[in-house]
């Protein structure tokens, strides 16, 4: 995963990802700097009351989330093709057109693909693409991926977020967990490959990075 994070930003030229990922993140203005576009890019939200009128400021962005969303959907399609090939495999085996070892190999590949899909989706659904904070600094909006590789926004109270200074996480690590006191959600962000756009508002939610680096 760390290798992917190093390679993806280098491959992202001005047109490298624009066409195949046209339904992903795109600019839309200051309050909501990223949104979904295109008819094939559903955008779901776990809304909190009153969020429609809130103004949000972007405090963190992980640009490689576009490539990871594409990879998630590609893996989903590959797994579907592998699983769909099982019934024809059983038919060919029953007709004597396939050996038992070939059928077992096909079943093993399908099982491995399913296991990898579950593992990757478990992580990708918790990987943070963008973080927003409202004007009053009381509500955190987390943009992450769904199982299908599309964007989903989750709203969390800032007062429920555990500061990194109170957790056991090391900010120097590739991935850092951000958790809630209520234990409802756990997300992962990468301070090494992501970009903090508003350090002041970020520090209000997660603590000052200089203090965190010196304390770990």
UniProtKB/Swiss-Prot annotation:
Keywords: Membrane, Mitochondrion, Mitochondrion inner membrane, Transmembrane, Transmembrane helix
GO biological process terms on file: mitochondrial respiratory chain complex I assembly
Transmembrane segments: 69-91, 104-124
Region (Disordered): 31-52
InterPro entries: Tmem186 (IPR026571)
Family, as annotated: Belongs to the TMEM186 family.
PANTHER family given in the database record: TRANSMEMBRANE PROTEIN 186 (PTHR13603:SF1)
UniProt protein name: Transmembrane protein 186
Gene: Tmem186
